[in-house]
A protein has these predicted regions:
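Cytochrome P450
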Residues: 1-424
Length: 424
């Protein structure tokens, strides 16, 4: 499949060309994991065709090892909940479509099988209890108010930088009890840890390695401080004072730290940005929300479905098995495309429409299912809910005034920039 460099054309024409190419390309040449499709936002017809014609598809036409694409909701659920057959172990390649690069095998509980997975995951769970979320809600609201009150009026600015990154970075600094003045390091490390070389985030694998080494050195210092001090209410301290994680080797420590940084950054940050874009692309839904702010409660999970901030998760087959009538061999990589399952026509009514009062909005796949379901999903929902409550109180409308710039990745489905303007 030949993906051309993006051309400056309007969205409707871009999608027309993408649909034409997707339906003209032989299925044997499909590579739905090509990052360019996600950066150009032209992935949709490719996955639409797979759902219709070959919902379990084997790709051999890619610059990476062959992989299975699982694109329908129920098939994805089957893979996601059968952890005895489908492994996320980093030693087998990890959780993304590309194998873990040599020297980057940092095992984390999301890239572990049982019983180690649950033992380590339970260590950080107290941070996300309903009681603790109630405590965090006050802080989230105060910070949202401060950030929003300082936004310019009648002036174009980057919503990603001024709002999404700033609010998620502040929360990460709180969760880790990280030095406040250096909090932007956390989102930088998150971006670098998932970036491809020449993606615009890092120029080379060597640059990525240098920055990850910096992350390791910095977080190791904080870790040693937590180990040698009384327990505190932050993620590092929870791990430092629990027997399941206290004696982690350095790679396991680094893996869990990166997991928690990325998890706390990408879902909220990119869905927050995506919500502004979705409401601008669907002005009748924006009007509906402004007329009835109580719809925030259903709008939040709907925009998480709509955005799908983590486009896929990968597993490795531990034995010969079958998905959708296709024979999967032991050792095969199996990619669950959440971004496609969330648009499955057999699961969702009008799946390509953004409907803020959609019935049963939490049936989306964006947080995964089974033992690896996102541990911080309620915190992500809470942050999105509060920021929209505060935005609706302050602004009649936030207007998108230019095309977003999307990340070059088929793993993190997010944004670098979203130019907006607040009238008034």
């Amino acid at each position: 499949m030949n993906i051309q460099a993006p051309v400056k054309v309007d969205k409707a024409e871009r999608m027309r060309r993408a649909r034409e190419e997707a339906y003209a390309t032989p299925l044997s040449q499909f590579h739905p994991g090509a990052p360019r499709l996600f950066q150009d936002d032209t992935l949709w017809p490719w996955f639409e065709r797979l759902r219709k014609e070959e919902p379990v598809h084997y790709c051999t036409n890619a610059p990476i090892e062959p992989y299975w694409s699982v694109v329908k909701y129920n098939d994805i659920m089957h893979v996601d909940t059968n952890h005895g057959i489908f492994s996320s172990d980093s030693k087998l390649g990890g959780i993304s479509i590309r194998d873990v690069p040599e020297g980057y095998d940092y095992p984390s509980f999301i890239a572990m099988d049982q019983p180690r997975h649950s033992a380590q995951r339970k260590t950080v769970s107290p941070m996300f209890t309903p009681q603790h979320l109630d405590e965090l809600a006050k802080l989230i609201r105060q910070r949202s108010q401060t950030v929003l009150d300082n936004l310019p009026r009648n002036e174009t600015f980057n919503f990603v930088e001024r709002v999404s990154i700033e609010l998620t970075t502040q929360m990460l600094a709180t969760l880790f009890d990280f030095p406040w003045e250096e909090r932007r390091k956390l989102t930088r490390w998150s971006d670098v840890s998932t970036a491809l070389p020449k993606s615009g985030i890092v120029a080379s694998a060597e640059e990525r390695r240098r920055e990850m080494d910096e992350c390791y050195a910095y977080m190791s210092k904080l870790w040693n401080e937590r180990v040698n001090s009384a327990p505190r209410n932050d993620l590092l301290s929870l791990m430092a004072h629990n027997e399941a994680t206290r004696h982690m080797d350095p790679d396991n420590l680094m893996g869990n730290i990166i997991l928690l940084i990325v998890g706390g950054n990408d879902t909220t940050r990119n869905t927050m940005t995506g919500s502004v874009l979705a409401l601008n692309e669907n002005p009748e839904q924006y009007d509906k929300l402004r007329a009835n702010p109580e719809l925030i409660d259903t709008m939040v999970p709907e925009v998480i479905r709509w955005q799908t901030p983590l486009a896929h998760m990968r597993r490795t087959a531990l034995q010969d098995t079958e998905i959708g009538g296709k024979h999967i061999r032991k050792g095969d990589r199996v990619v669950m495309w959440y971004v496609s399952g969330n648009r499955d026509e057999e699961m969702f009514d009008k799946p390509n429409e953004f409907i803020i009062d959609r019935p049963r909005p939490r049936t989306h796949l964006s947080f995964g299912f089974g033992i690896h379901r996102c541990v911080g999903m309620r915190l992500a929902e809470l942050q999105l809910k509060i920021v929209w409550e505060e935005m609706l109180q302050r602004f009649d409308r936030i207007e998108v005034v230019g095309e977003p710039k999307r990340i070059y990745s088929s793993f993190i489905k997010g944004y670098e920039t979203l130019p907006v303007r607040i009238p008034g």
